[in-house]
């Protein structure tokens, strides 16, 4: 056999069978010895690797065995506790029943002992009376005999023997305290280990997303009366479909749910979707999770754009407050630059106050003059949307509405044909009005604590509601030709904003019935211009 045919290449994967074949079939010689040594070395290396693999597997088995022993010990301890609890209950019941029997025995014994004592006394008195009467028969003196006879008559009349009941007050029957635990023994014989609950099944058809609430409904694949409660877990996500393992949000847990339905209310929908999963629990253990379900939670989310807001407004993401000192330092800097012949028009970067973050969204000029305005940072280009605004109690003047992006930096909401709003004025005289294109319509309704804004971009409708009662305050009917931004004006006070809200069901219902009302933007054409 040609030994050159069996030269091993470096890193060649040589099986044990091939190496053994080479050792067995190579002709003895100087070169063949080297090949046999190399083949044997391959066998040794393969055996060593296999030994390591087997040893690792043995270690795994030992670890598993240790886990079985530890878990079995824990389960046995729990089993002992459960049976000790049963024994304790049985001992308590036994002790209680023994006490009942002993009490009944003592009661009857006392009654019978009392009767025996009474009878003994009556018998003793009767025997004395009998002996006295017998002796009286031997009295010869008539007067003495007559006296004794009267005494005997009186004593007989008063004798307890004639008033004594000769019927036992109690019987010796104790059968009312007998027991028969055959049924309980049968129940005890049916004791067995609790099964692990099966995974519930969430029914997407029965789940409901409405009014910033989510109702999740599920069912068990088969009836299981051992289930004690359910655990519902949910998390927000921006990904459709199955939950991602590396999703950045953690599961939130709702425990101890007794039914097969649960409603989460008062949610802020600041993500596109929510994942849900549920598991059933019996007294011992929780079962597997259900297949996760992803529900859409679509809503308009936006913050206030502090990069273009008026310098006299202190703006945070969801609140704005009048700040009369805002921008004064910037104004003095601007005036100084004007004296040097430089332009006095402030850029967003130049006008950002010290406490205000840099103008990262600044795609437009900052509002100035008497336009104490701040816009939302998200444009509405289609669909129906809803948000709510609440004013501080001491707020002197504010406006709530929408505007095109082209709203000028000196323009006030409602005074141009590119903005629509309702305006509240509590300064000097109280007014509540709808404004558009510099025209005003007074509203004969009470200013609500919180205002709900409904914008139907495609339908060309902007409506304002009492956010609490859902009473319609006013509705503009128009045709939006550009994307609109939520707009807010405030003077001497502040506003807080609620976003991530679905269009309330009550508003949707009212929209269907109010689409024909006359309170529209066209009705402002005949109103006196301010």
Swiss-Prot record:
Residues 342-354 have a biased composition (Polar residues). Residues 102-141 form a coiled coil. Keywords: Acetylation, Coiled coil, Phosphoprotein. The keyword Phosphoprotein applies. Gene3D superfamilies: 1.20.5.170, 2.60.120.920, Immunoglobulins. The keyword Acetylation applies. Residues 322-366 are annotated as: Disordered. Transmembrane segments: none annotated. Residues 196-300 form the Fibronectin type-III domain. Residues 137-194 form the COS domain. SMART domains: BBC, SPRY. It holds the Pfam family SPRY. Residues 300-506 form the B30.2/SPRY domain. PROSITE patterns: B302_SPRY (PS50188), COS (PS51262), FN3 (PS50853). Residues 330-341 have a biased composition (Basic and acidic residues). The modification Phosphoserine is found at residues 520, 523. This is FSD1-like protein. It comes from Homo sapiens (Human). The lineage of its organism: Eukaryota, Metazoa, Chordata, Craniata, Vertebrata. The gene is FSD1L.
């Amino acid at each position: 056999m040609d030994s050159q045919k069996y030269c091993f290449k470096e890193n060649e994967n040589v099986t044990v069978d091939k190496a053994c074949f080479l050792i067995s079939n190579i002709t003895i010689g100087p070169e063949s010895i080297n090949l046999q040594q190399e083949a044997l070395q391959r066998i040794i290396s393969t055996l060593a690797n296999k030994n390591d693999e087997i040893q690792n597997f043995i270690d795994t088995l030992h670890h598993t065995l240790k886990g079985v022993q530890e878990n079995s010990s824990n389960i046995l301890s729990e089993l002992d506790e459960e049976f000790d609890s049963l024994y304790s209950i049985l001992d308590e019941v036994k002790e209680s029943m023994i006490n009942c029997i002993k009490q009944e025995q003592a009661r009857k014994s006392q009654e019978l002992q009392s009767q025996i004592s009474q009878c003994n006394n009556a018998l003793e008195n009767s025997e004395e009376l009998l002996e006295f009467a017998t002796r009286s028969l031997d009295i010869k003196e008539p007067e003495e005999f007559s006296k004794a006879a009267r005494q005997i008559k009186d004593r007989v009349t008063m004798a307890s023997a004639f008033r004594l009941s000769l019927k036992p007050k109690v019987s010796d029957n104790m059968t009312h305290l007998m027991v028969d635990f055959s049924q309980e023994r049968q129940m005890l014989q049916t004791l067995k280990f609790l099964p692990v609950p099966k995974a519930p099944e969430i029914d997407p058809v029965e789940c409901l997303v409405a009014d910033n609430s989510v109702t999740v409904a599920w069912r068990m694949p088969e009836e299981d009366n051992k289930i004690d409660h359910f655990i519902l877990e949910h998390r927000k996500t921006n990904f459709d479909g199955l939950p991602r393992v590396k999703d950045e949000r953690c599961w939130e847990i709702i425990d101890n749910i007794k039914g097969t339905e649960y409603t989460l209310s008062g949610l802020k929908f600041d993500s596109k979707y929510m994942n849900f999963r549920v598991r059933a629990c019996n007294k011992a253990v929780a079962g597997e999770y259900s297949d996760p379900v992803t529900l859409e939670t679509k809503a308009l989310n936006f913050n206030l754009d502090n990069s273009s807001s008026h310098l006299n407004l202190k703006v945070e993401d969801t609140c704005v407050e009048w700040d009369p000192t805002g921008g004064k330092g910037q104004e003095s800097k601007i005036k100084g630059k004007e004296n040097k012949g430089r332009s006095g028009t402030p850029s967003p970067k130049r006008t950002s106050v010290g406490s205000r973050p840099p103008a990262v969204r600044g795609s437009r000029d900052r509002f100035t003059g008497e336009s104490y305005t701040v816009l939302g940072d998200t444009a509405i280009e289609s669909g129906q949307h809803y948000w709510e605004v609440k004013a501080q109690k001491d707020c002197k003047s504010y406006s709530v509405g929408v505007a095109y992006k082209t709203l000028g930096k000196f323009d006030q909401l409602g005074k141009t044909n590119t903005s629509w709003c309702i305006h509240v004025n509590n300064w000097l005289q109280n007014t509540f009005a709808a404004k558009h294109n510099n025209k005003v319509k007074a509203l004969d309704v009470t200013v609500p604590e919180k205002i709900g804004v409904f914008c139907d971009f495609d339908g060309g409708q902007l409506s304002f509601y009492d956010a609490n009662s859902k009473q319609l305050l006013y509705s503009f009917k128009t045709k939006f030709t550009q994307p609109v931004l939520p707009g807010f004006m405030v003077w001497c006070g502040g506003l807080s904003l609620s976003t991530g809200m679905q269009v309330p069901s009550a508003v949707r219902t009212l929209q269907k019935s109010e689409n024909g009302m006359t309170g529209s933007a066209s009705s402002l054409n005949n109103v006196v211009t301010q």
